[in-house]
């Protein structure tokens, strides 16, 4: 499966993809009578993706390049990822909670696994 970030395609396996719909309010306040009053900004589609361990040298190179992009000090990126139904979804996002785990370290190479990232949408998918 592929993922596209800022027009660059990365051929990496996706082992899990969790999509959330987060509602953001301009304000939300509960009055003394217990009623919630709110002004909804919109619904943001955010994703958490876990990438699998590479199975060949090309995937290993793509995973290393993906790590560098995910850890750049850049405010926003254009990403295209499959949504929960496998349909390509393109949106502007920032990256959060980027992490990977050490699989094996040798004198010649370091091998990583379980690269995980959260894509947080810049703007809402749906608005009132």
List the predicted regions and their residue ranges:
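Extracellular/virion structural assembly segments
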Residues: 1-128
């Amino acid at each position: 499966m592929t993922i596209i970030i800022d027009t660059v395609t990365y051929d990496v396996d996706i082992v899990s993809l969790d999509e959330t719909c987060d509602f953001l309010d301009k304000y939300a306040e509960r009055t003394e009578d217990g009623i919630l009053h709110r002004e909804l900004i919109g619904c943001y589609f955010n994703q958490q993706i876990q990438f699998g361990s590479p199975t060949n040298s090309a995937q290993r190179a793509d995973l290393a390049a993906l790590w560098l992009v995910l850890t750049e000090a850049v405010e926003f990126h254009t990403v295209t990822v499959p949504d929960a139904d496998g349909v390509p979804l393109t949106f502007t996002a920032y990256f959060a909670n980027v992490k990977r785990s050490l699989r094996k370290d040798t004198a010649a190479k370091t091998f990583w696994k379980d690269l995980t990232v959260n894509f947080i949408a810049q703007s809402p998918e749906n608005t009132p």
